[in-house]
């Protein structure tokens, strides 16, 4: 019985993933139940979030290691990008811009450090291990948007 439940669950996960693949707009890449797109144009974090919202999405949030790895696959090597994390409301209480719970992290060693008291937005860093860093929201970087399939 447990094997049957496992197979049914596996089928449901894959069917949802294929459903997303069928309805992501051209240029957007499916992953599980969302569509993602990397934008190389360098803008500040607030502008990146507004640009994603204008496309019916938000900056990408990350809920598990596999999703983090997927996002890295969208970004050229040695490229820093914005994703949707911020602690602009209460210092060191990180939130996702889409409102989802913050349950997974991939911070670089000694991060977040709020360097000079002005780092409140989350970037994927260009370091060897492509970990997360808090950065000044006014820094201009490319970004990754996420949205539900249309």
Tell what function each PLM region has.
Residues 1-150:
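Extracellular, disulfide-bonded carbohydrate-recognition/adhesion ectodomains
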């Amino acid at each position: 019985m447990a094997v049957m439940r496992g197979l049914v669950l596996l089928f449901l996960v894959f069917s949802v993933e294929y459903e997303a693949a069928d309805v992501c707009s051209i240029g957007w890449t499916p992953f599980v139940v969302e569509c993602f797109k990397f934008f190389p144009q360098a803008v500040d974090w607030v502008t990146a979030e507004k640009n994603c919202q204008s496309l019916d999405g938000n900056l990408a949030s990350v809920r598990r290691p596999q999703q983090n790895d997927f996002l890295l696959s969208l970004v050229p090597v040695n490229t820093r990008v914005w994703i949707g994390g911020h602690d602009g409301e209460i210092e060191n209480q990180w939130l996702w811009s889409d409102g989802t719970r913050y349950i997974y992290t991939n911070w670089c060693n000694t991060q977040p450090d709020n360097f000079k008291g002005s780092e409140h937005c989350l970037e994927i860093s260009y370091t060897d291990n492509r970990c997360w860093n808090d950065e000044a929201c006014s820094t201009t970087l490319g970004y990754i948007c996420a949205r539900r399939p249309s």
